[in-house]
């Protein structure tokens, strides 16, 4: 996967520089849509077919988008460049890296919160507020429920993990007892 990230990085950075001249959120939506479309097996098979021209593949990708930016020259050029260089499969990684650049500019980060029980609005808001103080940046939460944690939460921000789950504590106790 590191290789895909390395290849996708220049595309994400170039697109981000273009987006800085306009609405970064709109460009983020566009690249997310492109990433979703590019993952469809039907699109990948059409894109790899020798019977379909590169211009037709680019038109197909742009036609599936809902974003108003899709009709702009910059979006068309970006998609055409990806098609010409056989980089459509990179779109999901380009979207991930574009989002990381957007978050870095906003001083924000995505946070994955896994809880043993569903978190209600007030609980989630309080947890996010305390995590923002701890990590010293604005956080965008994505919440999952995993009953195997037994209790507590596991929080992932970038490459940092904060695991306060009962399952993690039990695993720590087991390791201490068997050592």
Swiss-Prot record:
<keyword id="KW-0066">ATP synthesis</keyword>
<protein>
    <recommendedName>
        <fullName>ATP synthase subunit delta</fullName>
    </recommendedName>
</protein>
<dbReference type="Pfam" id="PF00213">
    <property type="entry name" value="OSCP"/>
</dbReference>
<keyword id="KW-0406">Ion transport</keyword>
<dbReference type="GO" id="GO:0045259">
    <property type="term" value="C:proton-transporting ATP synthase complex"/>
</dbReference>
<comment type="similarity">
    <text>Belongs to the ATPase delta chain family.</text>
</comment>
<dbReference type="InterPro" id="IPR026015">
    <property type="entry name" value="ATP_synth_OSCP/delta_N_sf"/>
</dbReference>
<dbReference type="GO" id="GO:0005886">
    <property type="term" value="C:plasma membrane"/>
</dbReference>
<keyword id="KW-0813">Transport</keyword>
<comment type="subunit">
    <text>F-type ATPases have 2 components, F(1) - the catalytic core - and F(0) - the membrane proton channel. F(1) has five subunits: alpha(3), beta(3), gamma(1), delta(1), epsilon(1). F(0) has three main subunits: a(1), b(2) and c(10-14). The alpha and beta chains form an alternating ring which encloses part of the gamma chain. F(1) is attached to F(0) by a central stalk formed by the gamma and epsilon chains, while a peripheral stalk is formed by the delta and b chains.</text>
</comment>
<keyword id="KW-0375">Hydrogen ion transport</keyword>
<keyword id="KW-1003">Cell membrane</keyword>
<keyword id="KW-0472">Membrane</keyword>
<keyword id="KW-0997">Cell inner membrane</keyword>
<comment type="function">
    <text>F(1)F(0) ATP synthase produces ATP from ADP in the presence of a proton or sodium gradient. F-type ATPases consist of two structural domains, F(1) containing the extramembraneous catalytic core and F(0) containing the membrane proton channel, linked together by a central stalk and a peripheral stalk. During catalysis, ATP synthesis in the catalytic domain of F(1) is coupled via a rotary mechanism of the central stalk subunits to proton translocation.</text>
</comment>
<comment type="function">
    <text>This protein is part of the stalk that links CF(0) to CF(1). It either transmits conformational changes from CF(0) to CF(1) or is implicated in proton conduction.</text>
</comment>
<dbReference type="GO" id="GO:0046933">
    <property type="term" value="F:proton-transporting ATP synthase activity, rotational mechanism"/>
</dbReference>
<dbReference type="InterPro" id="IPR000711">
    <property type="entry name" value="ATPase_OSCP/dsu"/>
</dbReference>
<keyword id="KW-0139">CF(1)</keyword>
